[in-house]
Structure formats: C-alpha cells, structure tokens
Amino acid sequence: MDKLGLIILAGGLSTRMGQPKALLSWVGGESLISHALRKGLDADVHDILISIGDDEQLGHAIQTHIIDTLSNDEQEKVSIVRDSIERCGPLGGLYSTLAVGPSPAYAVMAVDMPFMEMDLYFDWLYQVDHNDWNAIVPYSESGKSEPMAGIYRPYIASLIQSILVGENVSLHHALDVIGHVESIDATDFSWELSNINRFEDYQWARALAENEFRRVPLISVVASKRKTGKTTVVTRLVSELQRVGLSVGVVKSDKHGFHMDHEGTDTDLAYKAGANAVAIAGPNETAIRIRTKEQSSLYDLTQHMPVDIVILETRSQGIAPIIEVTKEGHTEELISDAMDRVATIEIGKLDQDVPELVRHIQEMMRSLNGRRYC
C-alpha cells in the first residue's frame, strides 16, 4: 500500500483519570497527544486525523498548544475531526474520521497507548499478502483482539454508520459486522498494546518511559524531612529486589561531608598526601575515592553503576520516577510532583506497600529489557 494515514483517537470522557488523557504530560516536555502526533510525523505520515469526540475545549487546546507550534509543512498534514454522531465512544470517532479521510487505509492509534509504534502497522500490512480486507486487527497475549490498534479501510464508514444507530456500539461488535478482518499475531508486543486506564497505570508508564533511554534505570526515594524513614525503605527495597534477581545500586546525597576510609590506612594516607583519586580492590569489593571541587552529579553517579537498577536516596525532589516516604497522616507535606510520583509510602505500612512496589518495578524492568533487546 502506497500511503497509510493515521487516526489518533484522542477523545473520550476519561472519567477514571479526572482529566482528558490526551493532555496528560509525558516525558521530554510532551503530552500524550503530542507524543502520538510526533510518531506519525516522524514516520512521514502525510494524513493525520485527530479525533476529539465532541470536546471543543480539547480541540482548542490541541490546536493552539500543539498544532499551531508545528512547521507549516507539518501543519498541512494534521486535521482535527469532531464526532458527527455524538456520544458513541471510540466507534463514533472511527466513523467520523474514516468518513472524511482521503487515504486508502488508516492506522488507528489510541492516545492512551503511548508505547505503540508506527513500524508495527507497516509490518502488519506487509504480513497480509492480499487486498481483500476491510480491517487488520492485532490480537494480544491474552488472545483478545485490539481494535484500538487496528488498520481500517475508509469505505467501511457506511457499515459503521449503520451500527451506530443500534444499541451495541462497541468496536468488537463492529468487527463482527464489517467482516473481512485479518487477525495479526501481536503476542510479542503486549507492552506496545497496553493502554492507560487508571492514574496508577499512567504513573508507571511514565516511569518506564523516563527510564527507557537511560544507561541504568533508576528510581528515587525522597522525603521532605530527616528521620522519616528513607533509609529503611531503601534497604527494604534493596533486599526484596535482590531476592527477585535484580542487582541493585544505591546513590545517596550528603551535603555535610562523609568518611568512607579508615584513619591511617594506605589509601587514607595517599589521599591526605594529595592524591586526586585512590582505589582499592579486594576479593569481594572495590572502592574508589575521588577528590572533587563540588558535589558530583547524583544522576551521573547512577549511570555509571554496574547494576540493573539504582535507587537514589535524597531529601530533594528527586529524579522521576519517585517514591516519597511520609510519616502517617502527613501527606500534605509531599514535595514530589504527582506526575512523577509512582508511590507514597508510610513507614508503618512497609509490609503492605513494598511487595506491590517490587511487582511494579519487576514489570518495568521486564518491559525495559524487552524493548531494548528485542
């Protein structure tokens, strides 16, 4: 197929999120909608339709804060489409965009599937060796079809219109009606097909995105005050993560200075004599002491550790993703940004909270390794 257009489904009530998903912040200064749009533009898609449902405020925000900031050439490739039939969910958005779309086929990307990649759509098109199809729809590891990540012909719009006058306006029902649907095995792409339904899903998806291009993934443990229990949380996490097979590093800030050597040792004497750096290697551990003019970058230290993941312990706001430690009933003193914070832990509830944290971190690490080495 010569040209593939892109439909971004950005509308929807987002009742579980409390705000439009499309405008949620993402990494690199992007929002979820600008992130999806950039994928289409970077793939040189010349026909991108953004479905906003019937949300005029959302459409205005996307136009003024995103589309108007693009180059003239990029702006010509993007159109906002409002639902011509109100309150029909994703199927209404699909109908409204297909009904006006000039391209021979459209990939559909839900705005709450931030790890979906354009390359997958082109791969799926290549796998179908004939043109007798109305839709190409992947199925996930669970065996369930994923119509929000499918490819559709515009001429099925008339069939979808007939469905919208009925009671069942689900995308899965629509697939049964339109027929000639090619199913694609996408069981190896569970993370790409995952979507963000709850705020917790969003927080951990951002955690993955923040860590995706780091040499060493990290997670910060912060607290607004001393003696809150940061070190207790860190040591508990280290123990539990090591137990499930992850090698863990710890970086800690100390603005008051510290001592890691013993008085009178050879390395201590060499350092006091003026050596800019000393190192010692034993059978089971290695230590390096470096003289600096100012405090070293904590982030740089995390990126040079030979481990799977680093925990950064600090009293500052930390580096996303962040776990914040509080005393019981003191959540009003939180210092981290809610968008960067994946968890809030009360020191008295470690037995309850740590296993869930470890599970999320394991899932993040598995997804990171799959995306880096697949």
Residue ranges and their predicted role:
Residues 2-168, 177-191, 265:
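Nucleotide and nucleotide-moiety/phosphate-recognizing core
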Residues 4, 213-256:
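Walker A (P-loop) phosphate-binding motif
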Residues 55-64, 258-260, 330-334:
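Short, charged/polar "capping" segments at the starts of alpha-helices
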Residues 169-215:
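Conserved alpha/beta core of the MobA/IspD/sugar-nucleotide pyrophosphorylase nucleotidyltransferase superfamily
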Residues 213-215, 243-244, 263, 273, ...:
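C-terminal accessory "lid"/substrate-recognition subdomains
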Residues 238-293:
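N-terminal phosphate/diphosphate-binding loop that engages ATP/GTP or pyrophosphate donors
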Residues 290-317:
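Phosphate-binding/switch loop-helix module in NTP-utilizing enzymes
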Residues 312-373:
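Phosphate/Mg2+-binding loops and adjacent switch elements
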